[in-house]
Amino acid sequence: MKYIIVTGGVMSGLGKGITIASIGRNLKDKGYKVTAIKIDPYINIDAGTMSPYQHGEVFVLKDGGEVDLDLGNYERFLDTELTRDHNLTTGKIYLEVISKERRGDYLGKTVQIIPHVTNEIKSRIRKVAARSGADICLIEIGGTVGDIESMPFLEAVRQMHREEPSENIAFIHVTLAMEDLQGEQKTKPSQHSVKELRALGLSPEVIVVRSKSPLQESAKEKIALFCDVPQELVISAHDADDIYEVPLEIEEQGLTTQLMKHLQLESSVENGAWKKMVSRMHSTTNTVKLAIVGKYTNLEDSYLSILEAVKHGGIDNGCRVEVNMVEAEILEENPAEIEKLIQYDGILIPGGFGGRGTEGKMMAIKFARENDIPFLGICLGMQLAVIEFARNVAKLKGANSTEFDEDSPYPVIDLLPEQTGVAEMGGTMRLGDYEAILTEGSIAAKIYGTNYIVERHRHRYEVNPEFVDRLESYGIVFSGKNKNRMEIAEIPGKRFFFGSQFHPEFRSRPGRPSPPFNGLVAAMCKYRKEREGR
């Protein structure tokens, strides 16, 4: 097994995840099987209970793991499926070490950071890498070098470097070159960051430097000299128009070749699919406008996978999707604002929790339905579409979800039966992959091209089966089901009106878009042409 370990310095949020994903993409295009592990040095067991404002979206894996959004980038770039074990947290490590101590596994020894915690970290990394069957395992250590939280993980990989043959492990350090008022890129923060890393016993083979513009030659020379790496291994990771360009940018600088040389890997395979996909992305000539009506609109990372899935649909349909975030509560406070949605070619209601903004979202759903604007509702978005339909079409006055109104006379959305009595929040929802059978001839069957699908879920509430027949008699169709669970709702005869209880965005890939998103964008493109009289 070959390991590539990525650390970060100067500040957090530099893009270590995109760096790892891009390196992995390029190695995959050389014919290697690649996997990735994200280490998050927080005490939370997973990301499931974190606020989107604090940590961005929670990405859901096939096995139900609720993880950091970086794993979503890994899956999209590497076109792979990971598991909850690919996300290590301090909480997971300490929980296991303490459990072993309580069982007596340490045979009366004093349990310490070294060796017990570091051994657990190394063991988990190696087990995950081995189980994946990969040739190369990329590891991102979250946070910044110098953070007290990441010390045990840095010590663990230092020990791995000592235990593994030198040709089996490579270290990459991501830093930042800031520009002064004269436009000169300053290298001192990078120098100090590498110095701090070396004080921990780690020396990077490669330094990836984030910057606004391409790294100046003088800056590259300074970093190479003072950080003691060859100049060709100082890589410019300057801002790109789109993150999907990053693999191509670092490939042009020879990083893949240099890593393969260090790891003693050889390959004559050249897969140009990624380059072709990026070329298609840039060759789009038409633009359509999408409104995402939500409650976490101030932080785009809250809806990262949705934005990426929309982009994938745009690439496949040959158009650029201009996305605007609309705060649902603004529609509630000023109902006249709803008329502004007429300018959009599509409306999307994402998932979420809690009652804040739900009435505003339903106003947007009603507007989309009545004006026949292509619509996609995801998870809570589908549930709200069902409530809106029940209220305004089926005339069930007061219809609601028991999440928002336990005394609703028409609880068309209700708690999953198995959720009754569940007290803990973390890891207790209906999570991960579940199948659905699609109705033949439905919109769902048409866009998926099959009657059997598997998609990822994250919810506690569902369409109440007691109301299904009554609602369907008014024209809505529940075209995807898991036994007696409603997975998809659609309204035939519309340009595109589709809701999914699952989260299709988590399985969307560049070059292989999620069918609901592809269907939405296709309908938007067609609608735009109709509006322009083409």
Swiss-Prot record:
Domain Glutamine amidotransferase type-1: residue ranges: 289-530
Segment forming the signal sequence: none
Binding locations of ATP: 13-18, 70
Region (Amidoligase domain): 1-265
Pathway(s) where this gene product acts: Pyrimidine metabolism; CTP biosynthesis via de novo pathway; CTP from UDP: step 2/2
Mitochondrion keyword on record: no
EC number(s) reported in the record: 6.3.4.2
Domain of life: Archaea
Family of the protein in this entry: Belongs to the CTP synthase family.
Protein name: CTP synthase
Upper lineage: Archaea, Methanobacteriati, Methanobacteriota, Stenosarchaea group, Methanomicrobia
